[in-house]
A protein has these predicted regions:
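Flexible loop/turn connectors
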Residues: 233-234, 238-346
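Short acidic capping loops at alpha-helix termini that bridge into adjacent secondary structure
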Residues: 181-182, 213-217, 267-273
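Short beta-strand scaffold positions
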Residues: 7, 124, 246-248
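Short acidic/polar active-site loop segments enriched in Thr and Asp
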Residues: 13, 59, 120, 181-182, ...
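Alpha-helical recognition/docking segments in bacterial nutrient-uptake
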Residues: 60-64, 68-173, 177, 237, ...
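Hinge/beta->alpha junction and helix N-cap segments in small-molecule ligand-binding domains
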Residues: 67-80, 98-107, 160-170, 186-233, ...
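N-terminal helix-turn-helix DNA-binding module of bacterial transcription factors
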Residues: 1-60, 343-346
Length: 346
């Protein structure tokens, strides 16, 4: 069935049907719902080339990855986000354009995407403090949604984020309630906004209990298994080692676990571990009973939400930038237990 045949069945003009299918704001919701239902009932799929010609849209969304953060591409967290976003694009007949560029060429890439009309919008990843990409995208008029937030940015922008500060505050409070006082923070790179918010939550929880933070127990590195292992081994070798670790990802938490076991210790009995982002499609945190206690948020769902938000901005430009703050659940697993009494295990 083509567009003309669908319009004939509905008793509407092809232009109205096309505008309803493509999210034009001047089409009222009753008509839009009627058109969408008929398209689904008759298994109508719009011709992407025809849509591009009719609307002037590229029917594509961009994701620009600087080489400095190219490890993101093989990170299962990034992969889950892209999978969630991709599901939304596919349902709406949008393509995904993934560009890996040098850091020096990032601004030029955004400007080129805009000037050539290769994409209708972009999702911005790994926001930093006062991220210069946000005012740039506003300046060139390219619709965008930020996965995360950028503290210090004076430019209004659309974003989807997890409440990282509250998640790490709750996790630290849980460990404190178990009697732990030497709690190590294995954080991500702290030029990124999410990592700063996680450290803030950790520090807030310690301050509320009157515990002074120990710089020797706080680290900021890439969230890899190797770095988690290296940090865990170094901290456990201290004269007064931590009795608990709070890791910014399941992957770095796995490295911490390896360091614990190499010393003949048992995770959950001798040393407790809490991780973040355990709800990954291809790296599950156990089955019936979680292996790790975790602050859980679905990165895949965040990808879906960000993509839906961006497509809404593309369909109805000029609206106020929307925001969505997702809360993380605290999932109790086998990796945490009461702080050991007596001398710290070595």
């Amino acid at each position: 069935m083509n567009l003309k045949e669908l319009a004939l069945r509905l008793g509407l003009s092809p232009t109205t049907v096309s505008r309803a299918l493509n999210g034009y704001p001047e089409v009222n919701e009753t008509t839009r719902a009627r058109v969408m239902a008929a398209a689904k009932r008759h298994n109508y799929r719009p011709n992407t080339r025809a849509i591009r010609l009719a609307t002037g849209r590229a029917m594509a969304v961009g994701h620009v990855i600087p080489l400095a953060t190219r490890h993101e591409i093989v990170n299962p967290v990034f992969a889950d986000f892209i999978a969630g976003a991709g599901e939304t694009y596919s349902r709406n007949d949008y393509d995904m354009v993934l560009s890996v560029v040098s850091d020096a060429d990032e601004e030029t890439t955004y400007r080129t995407l805009r000037s050539k009309g290769n994409v209708d919008g972009v999702i911005l990843h790994a926001p930093r403090l006062d991220d210069p990409r946000i005012p740039l995208l506003r300046e060139i008029g390219l619709p965008f949604v930020v996965h995360g937030r950028s503290t210090g940015s004076a430019t209004p922008y659309a974003w989807v984020d997890v409440n990282n500060r509250r998640a790490f505050q709750r996790a630290t409070e849980f460990l404190l309630d178990l009697g732990h006082r030497r709690i190590a923070l294995v954080n991500g790179l702290e030029f990124m906004d999410f990592a700063i918010r996680r450290r803030t939550g950790y520090l807030d929880a310690l301050a509320a209990r009157g515990i002074a933070p120990d710089p020797a127990l706080m680290t900021s590195e890439e969230m890899t298994e190797i770095s988690g292992h290296r940090i865990g081994a170094r901290m456990l070798a201290q004269p007064d080692p931590p009795t608990a670790f709070l890791a910014s990802s399941m992957i770095s938490g796995m490295g911490v676990r390896r360091a614990i076991e190499e010393r003949g210790l048992v995770m959950g009995r001798d040393v407790s571990v809490i991780i973040h982002d355990d709800d990954l499609s291809y790296m599950k945190n156990g089955e019936d009973v979680p292996i790790y206690t975790a602050t859980r948020s679905s990165v895949r769902e965040a990808g879906r939400i960000a993509a839906e938000m961006l497509l809404g901005l593309i369909a109805a430009p000029g609206q106020e930038p929307p925001h969505r703050l997702l809360e993380a659940d605290l999932i109790i697993g086998q990796s945490t237990g009461p702080a050991p009494t007596g001398p710290a295990p070595r």
